[in-house]
Design a protein with these regions (language model features):
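Short secondary-structure boundary/capping segments
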Residues: 57, 112-113, 175-178
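Well-ordered, non-membrane alpha-helical segments in soluble/globular domains
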Residues: 74-81, 134-146, 180-188
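Short acidic/His/Gly/Ser-rich catalytic and metal-binding motifs that mark active-site loops
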Residues: 50-51, 104-109, 113-116, 168-173
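Catalytic-core regions built around general acid/base machinery
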Residues: 144-156
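A solvent-exposed, charged loop/short amphipathic helix patch at secondary-structure junctions
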Residues: 106-140
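Loop/turn-to-beta-strand initiation segments
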Residues: 92-95, 154-161
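Conserved P-loop
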Residues: 1-98, 102-107
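Phosphate-binding/switch region of NTP-binding enzymes
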Residues: 6, 159-212
Length: 212
């Protein structure tokens, strides 16, 4: 039987908005591990696609690093993963799914700016100027994400990442002709840093027939 947690790499699920990625995860958990309690959806930042679904174990990570707040009943993504790793013998979680890559990136970006201000003592306003520029800001974001994913891999927990797709205009390097390519919503460098090491990349599409 396939052990999804034996691969130290994520599974990426790409599709257009409203495709049903979160529903897919809800159904997959029961199919793969027999019980909804074996999977955890981490809804990142402003993502809120889980509210209409039942039989789904979910926790919201509105920030990257934040201690539990009794008033809001929320904690940071790092604290969620800390809890998983420390107590998973009790929880029995087999797989974690991040919903979505772009909102995961957003909370990591906010944390990166906070770290930059703390380390440099400067009022860093954008990722492009973080640590003097030269792409150091985006590189730190990727490292933050990869570090947390690695913690889950090493704990034997399968990692899935949901992300959106869009059409991007490309130019053929030989002919110079422009064409559209269905691809991810992220910047190429950020996406490649995760996707190039993925165990599997699954792309869902919607086909519509309009009559009349």
């Amino acid at each position: 039987k396939c052990d999804f947690g034996s691969y130290q790499a994520p599974y990426l699920i790409l599709s257009p908005r409203k495709f049903g990625k979160t529903t897919w995860w809800r159904n997959f958990v029961v199919e793969a591990w027999g019980d909804a309690s074996k999977g955890l959806l981490i809804s990142c930042g402003t993502e809120s696609g889980f509210h209409a679904l039942d039989n789904l174990q979910v926790e919201e990570a509105l920030e990257w690093d934040a201690e539990y707040d009794e008033e809001t009943d929320h904690r940071g993504l790092v604290q969620i993963i800390d809890d998983l790793i420390d107590n998973n013998k009790e929880y029995g979680i087999k797989g974690v799914c991040f919903d979505t890559f772009d909102t995961l990136y957003d909370i990591a970006a906010a944390e990166t700016l906070r770290i930059c201000r703390k380390e440099t003592g400067k009022n860093c306003k954008s990722l492009l100027e973080a640590w003097g520029g030269y792409n150091r800001g985006p590189e730190r974001i990727v490292k933050l994400i990869q570090d947390q994913l690695t913690r889950l891999y090493r704990a034997g927990i399968a990692v899935f990442i949901l992300t959106h797709t869009k059409f991007k205009e490309r130019t053929d390097p030989l002919t110079g002709e422009k064409y559209e390519q269905l691809t991810n919503l992220m910047q190429d460098r950020t996406y490649s840093a995760i996707a190039d090491n993925a165990q599997m990349v699954i792309v869902g599409t919607l086909e519509r027939n309009i009559n009349g």
